[in-house]
Amino acid sequence: MSEEQEPKTSEAEYGTMDFPEFENEEEWLFKVLGIKPRPSSDLDDADKQEDEPLGHTEFLRLQDILQEDKVSSTNDSDTCQAGYTEENDEASHSDSDIDDNVNVIIGDIKANSSMYMEMFTNMNSQADQDLKLTESDNAMYPTD
């Protein structure tokens, strides 16, 4: 009664068995980005760390990309400046800070949470009372 045992494979080996094209992650990344990787000997040489000169067509292509970025960023800033006026600002931000009822609790809630929950409940009831008062006056905002 002998059982055939399959050799155990590690997770890394198992993962690359199904997808051999992903065996070397760096090569895959370079392939996806469209970059030709340099040989490791080039990276080790300190003398060869200088940038290689660009070809004329590559230089022109990069120059066009940079020029397009300059034009689009200039247009964006002009649009922002033209669209912003004081009248537009007041109309779009009709909600004033006076209307805001904000209470901030600072402290360690873990220390005594019941005290903070009581304060929170009191704040909610006060807000409900304020809302009832404004509804009875048929006002949209408490300060109107």
Swiss-Prot record:
<feature type="compositionally biased region" description="Polar residues">
    <location>
        <begin position="72"/>
        <end position="82"/>
    </location>
</feature>
<feature type="region of interest" description="Disordered">
    <location>
        <begin position="67"/>
        <end position="99"/>
    </location>
</feature>
<dbReference type="Pfam" id="PF17397">
    <property type="entry name" value="TSX"/>
</dbReference>
<comment type="function">
    <text>May have an RNA/DNA binding role.</text>
</comment>
<protein>
    <recommendedName>
        <fullName>Testis-specific protein TSX</fullName>
    </recommendedName>
</protein>
<dbReference type="InterPro" id="IPR035352">
    <property type="entry name" value="TSX"/>
</dbReference>
